Amino acid sequence: MITIAESHPQIHHSPPDTTAPSTPPTATIFRSRLPDIVLSNHLPLHEYLFENTLTSPSPCIISASTGRSYSFAETHLLSRKTASFLSSRCGVRRGGVVMLLLHNCPEFVFSFLGSSMLGAVTTAANPFCTPQEIKKQLLASGATVIITQSAYASKISRDDDVEDLIVVTVSDNELERHAAPPEGCVSFSEVESADEDAVPDAVGVGPEDAVAMPFSSGTTGLPKGVVLTHKSMTSSVGQIVDGENPNLHLRKGEDVLLCVLPLFHIFSLNSVLLCGLRTGAAVVIMARFEMEGMLETIQRWGVSVAAVVPPLVLALAKNPLVEKYDMGTVRMVLSGAAPLGKELEAVLKGRLPQAVLGQGYGMTEAGPVISMSPGFAKQPTPVKSGSCGTVVRNAELKVMDPETGFSLGRNQPGEICVRGPQIMKGYLNDPEATSATIDVEGWLHTGDVGYVDDDDEVFIVDRVKELIKFKGFQVPPAELEALLLGHPSIADAAVIPQNDEVAGEVPVAFVVPSKSSDLTEEIVKEFISKQVVFYKRIHRVYFIHAIPKSPSGKILRKDLRAKVASFSS
């Protein structure tokens, strides 16, 4: 069995650049507007989450599809039963790895928490991944158990590489529940008869032990296992929701959080599920996104806090179905995972005037939250449109000049770097990638271009690798995308570089027209040309039915680049 204990990433750091000046400028370090707090990051994650909520009588987890709710005590009990099942039936021990190949469901919650109780590690994957992608993550992570819905069991390889693998299947409905599991699989229903008092003693699980291993987005390279420890995850949740004036104020026994974003993505896992568990708020779980189903869920359960990504903001802002439902209970809309344009913010605020709309910013490797709007705090402060808020408490942020490596001051764009107890331990078995991401001083280099303004607010300009170079000028795609979405006949858009013999690269746009629009390439080009400097003008427009995006809402630019390359060949 490959275990994290046996294969901790060794964090090697590159030697300092001896060509740099010996006396670089004094670094400008940015911190939160909110004061630091005492973090309870010495506790194992599962103990920390239930520390103040175990006796709460209010709902903890609600299944939108079945209507069943679980109290905090029931959630804890079923998680202990799952831990017992994983140990006695599947042989999982401290340091072992469990893979979750699940759509959002209560069993995801019980499996994640149960693994933590054993001192084991979970790695989650998208059930829509191909069998080859699933096998690649399975082998890379060293998982010995996969928990999945019955419909996806056939995707799991049973060749010699994974012959000892145990596949546990979750039933999607009552009919499946009473049927035998697929051949060679174990039914998750066995959890119900497991002895919750037979959980092996997990004493010795320390803050630096791994608890989760998400695989980082493959949008800029090959996916890599990100080792997040108990300390990483308790720190990140604490930075957001703990203290007398939490950055994200969730009300115990009152708030209902919408969990429609996939739990296999760190944004939903951290900022929805774990924050809800810690604060005593209810989490209503939707198996997958469907517009009318989401609106019905918000209305039925009185959702008060909606964590979304820009594509959902776009749907909430422009889809006429929204007008059919009562959205009056929504008091906060938190957008993350990808940049949100000012124009889209304004449209949504017009539709949900009672709600506070704001952004958070993060990345998997950062644990994940780096900054969050203080407009969500118990004692809120105003935030500018387009801002990602201020850096979270108990962390530091600096902006680095990519050319010189020197720290930059306010209002100067550069690479965002973050340091704090929440960042990853490293990439699994990849010391070279780890040392390229976390420097000798503990700064995690995000690869994102941004700046901090005079009010300590963080603004993201773009990804370093996504910047378009037009005759040496830098063109940020996110800026042009935000402008395009401001056109009433454009439903969605993405901008990427296209190679050009003269300019090197030119910006080209993929546009999804609104229904029954008369949009043409010239109309789009002219619309942008009126708003930008010459080198930011759109050179080509490709009309498309949908912009390809990851489950977290990030534009899959490499897919669009492949389309452009096919047009040229």
From Swiss-Prot:
It holds the Pfam family AMP-binding. Residues 1-24 are annotated as: Disordered. Pathway: Phytoalexin biosynthesis; 3,4',5-trihydroxystilbene biosynthesis; 3,4',5-trihydroxystilbene from trans-4-coumarate: step 1/2. The keyword ATP-binding applies. GO terms for molecular function: 4-coumarate-CoA ligase activity; ATP binding; trans-cinnamate-CoA ligase activity. SUPFAM superfamilies: Acetyl-CoA synthetase-like. It catalyses: (E)-4-coumarate + ATP + CoA = (E)-4-coumaroyl-CoA + AMP + diphosphate. Keywords: ATP-binding, Ligase, Nucleotide-binding, Phenylpropanoid metabolism. ATP binds at residues 216-220, 265, 337-339, 359-360, 364, 448, 463, 554. Mostly expressed in stems, and, to a lower extent, in bulbs. InterPro entries: AMP-bd_C, AMP-bd_C_sf, AMP-binding_CS, AMP-dep_synth/lig_dom, ANL_N_sf. Residues 360-427 are annotated as: SBD2. One of its GO terms (biological process) is phenylpropanoid metabolic process. PANTHER family: 4-COUMARATE--COA LIGASE 3, LONG-CHAIN-FATTY-ACID--COA LIGASE. Both substrate-binding domains (SBD1 and SBD2) are involved in the substrate recognition, and are sufficient to confer the substrate specificity. Belongs to the ATP-dependent AMP-binding enzyme family. Produces CoA thioesters of a variety of hydroxy- and methoxy-substituted cinnamic acids, which are used to synthesize several phenylpropanoid-derived compounds, including anthocyanins, flavonoids, isoflavonoids, coumarins, lignin, suberin and wall-bound phenolics. This is 4-coumarate-CoA ligase 2.
